Amino acid sequence: MAHRKLESVGSGMLDHRVRPGPVPHSQEPESEDMELPLEGYVPEGLELAALRPESPAPEEQECHNHSPDGDSSSDYVNNTSEEEDYDEGLPEEEEGITYYIRYCPEDDSYLEGMDCNGEEYLAHSAHPVDTDECQEAVEEWTDSAGPHPHGHEAEGSQDYPDGQLPIPEDEPSVLEAHDQEEDGHYCASKEGYQDYYPEEANGNTGASPYRLRRGDGDLEDQEEDIDQIVAEIKMSLSMTSITSASEASPEHGPEPGPEDSVEACPPIKASCSPSRHEARPKSLNLLPEAKHPGDPQRGFKPKTRTPEERLKWPHEQVCNGLEQPRKQQRSDLNGPVDNNNIPETKKVASFPSFVAVPGPCEPEDLIDGIIFAANYLGSTQLLSERNPSKNIRMMQAQEAVSRVKRMQKAAKIKKKANSEGDAQTLTEVDLFISTQRIKVLNADTQETMMDHALRTISYIADIGNIVVLMARRRMPRSASQDCIETTPGAQEGKKQYKMICHVFESEDAQLIAQSIGQAFSVAYQEFLRANGINPEDLSQKEYSDIINTQEMYNDDLIHFSNSENCKELQLEKHKGEILGVVVVESGWGSILPTVILANMMNGGPAARSGKLSIGDQIMSINGTSLVGLPLATCQGIIKGLKNQTQVKLNIVSCPPVTTVLIKRPDLKYQLGFSVQNGIICSLMRGGIAERGGVRVGHRIIEINGQSVVATAHEKIVQALSNSVGEIHMKTMPAAMFRLLTGQETPLYI
């Protein structure tokens, strides 16, 4: 087996091949679906090369100060929005089964969201979220983190961030800000799994690359209003650097035409050891005449594209509607589809070239597409929670590799038993990466084996010379085979989802991960340009300066550090008697995440003592700390007190209503949290809202001295979006609010 050794940027290990444009959806083959067993799928005759040991993990880095040093074991995370739970059936092979992929953008490494019917992102401009249940969503942030590997940030001297970031897609999701953490996380938006092993579609069709395939069931979901996304971004221009916000929609991003040029990354040169791969064409999307035997494929050189033409693509794509069966998305796009001479086009063309996006490739080359040589080792499926931690993500990647390795060994033993010889040949593939999609093509035939829109990638990790690519299937509106609840009524976080995992071997595993992260950043820039937004306006420094001048957690630090508020109580109770309390979560974003006393049973031990009040936060019970524990665990500890006669509590006396103070100097600064029906659903880490004391799961009771308990949802959003200066709010846990207002019957423990 000939290993294809490619030159990297520094070491000459990267085979950098370019294609003029990704294969259009309309040219993708239709194939039947194939359900992969949970144990995994490995093509016969494959053998996994030994994994190289992992390099030491990089130190945790802040999102704006990243070292360029990478880690040989990095990972990329994308949790997409659970709000976007419309159906999108994706065909696979052989069994005629349709699977679905579901949105889930809030990763525990960045956002903590509660179960809401929908989200409302606070901004001065409304932004709809395509969901069946939520009301109009108003978004309040764009991101400061980009999808880049190995802990580097995409901003000037910064390299790839380890954060996660959803990207706008064919149904543009809310643009959410994501923080960076360790292990080189990077993130996309909507996850999906498309056309596993299409039988034809080698990418060499001459049809328009603007034609996109759509299922009939998606028509309603495609009718989003991009106008509102763009308006929101324009009003939040100071939030993030474009180089660190890698959100993009393959449908809204640039789609190079067949006549566009092929430009290779200058620092990357193709250098392969003699093998059959040297005979492969550099361009995957050849014109029809280039496919005839007599035509020289390598000599084909498309028309050179000027910078102005490059900048015009994304806007033309949005204006022309991409031949999709959706209505015109913006009021200024209702003219003829060939009329691109509108003010925004001129504005886009006036923008400078790409803002610096650190990575191994030139931005223009990622638009055209680049190719890495790799060996396809196999695929498997894993069950995963909605928002697993970073460590669990990496463990899942390692588990996928282990399963594929076991399957390869089994295939090898079976082949020997059948006296077929022990010659093992790995499937050599070309891994095509662009701002539109990631494709896996057979190295010899150039037939498409797998095709994923860039937005569908939920996670990617490189472990030594192994690359693991993951995508999670969307949930249908009704019960789905892809979601298995462990117990009836289980919380969302307890549900299990099927993750499809593809495993590849390549000496450029790290570069592959970096290139995918860079592709997200470039795609996001193209999305902004397409909608008349100058990426250079998204400055992070000014927002960071505002953050650094604000106190953390409002008055919480003072309150919790005051010894008069910290009490140690001794409660007497009868054996077999319950404590008689209801506890709720303090809410993500609180200085000490623990449980809050929400109600007490009349005549119960807690009420009889006269020492407890609603709103008190319980730090420990009988020496067992409750800080940071899940609500169910805390409830279990309290239930375990039933047979005891004395209970020792450590509490912090707190009022039931939390006071929030958000300092917003200007409307251009995002608030950094989302609400639905007055309930805070998610919170941006490190934003002015977190600094001010906003907590996930809290119900907003009052804004600037005015009660909003009976106020319509839209008016709450409007009040917050238009507020500037000091924004005073009062909130309390939503569960406590429902108990106090009689909307729920308390279940005492």
Swiss-Prot record:
GO molecular function: amyloid-beta binding; identical protein binding
Keywords: Phosphoprotein, Protein transport, Repeat, Transport
GO biological process: chemical synaptic transmission; in utero embryonic development; locomotory behavior; multicellular organism growth; nervous system development; presynaptic modulation of chemical synaptic transmission; protein transport; regulation of gene expression
Compositional bias of kind Acidic residues: 81-94, 131-142
Domain (PDZ): residue spans on this chain: 568-654, 659-734
Membrane-traversing stretches: none
Compositionally biased intervals (Polar residues): 70-80, 238-247
Gene3D superfamilies membership: 2.30.42.10, Pleckstrin-homology domain (PH domain)/Phosphotyrosine-binding domain (PTB)
GO cellular component: cytoplasm; dendritic spine; plasma membrane; presynapse; Schaffer collateral - CA1 synapse
Tissue: Brain.
Residues where Phosphoserine is found: 11, 208
Span list, region Disordered: 1-94, 130-220, 238-344
Region STXBP1-binding, residue ranges: 185-270
Biased composition (Basic and acidic residues): 305-315
Span of domain PID: 368-555
Record CDD domains: PDZ1_APBA1_3-like, PDZ2_APBA1_3-like, PTB_X11
Entry text on domains: Composed of an N-terminal domain that binds STXBP1, a middle phosphotyrosine-binding domain (PID/PTB) that mediates binding with the cytoplasmic domain of the amyloid-beta precursor protein, and two C-terminal PDZ domains thought to attach proteins to the plasma membrane.
Function: Putative function in synaptic vesicle exocytosis by binding to STXBP1, an essential component of the synaptic vesicle exocytotic machinery. May modulate processing of the amyloid-beta precursor protein (APP) and hence formation of APP-beta.
PANTHER family listed in its UniProt record: AMYLOID-BETA A4 PRECURSOR PROTEIN-BINDING FAMILY A MEMBER 2 (PTHR12345:SF12), SYNTENIN RELATED (PTHR12345)
Subunit description: Part of a multimeric complex containing STXBP1 and syntaxin-1. Binds to the cytoplasmic domain of amyloid-beta protein, and to the nuclear factor NF-kappa-B/p65 via its PDZ domain. Interacts with the N-terminal domain of NECAB3.
Protein's UniProt name: Amyloid-beta A4 precursor protein-binding family A member 2
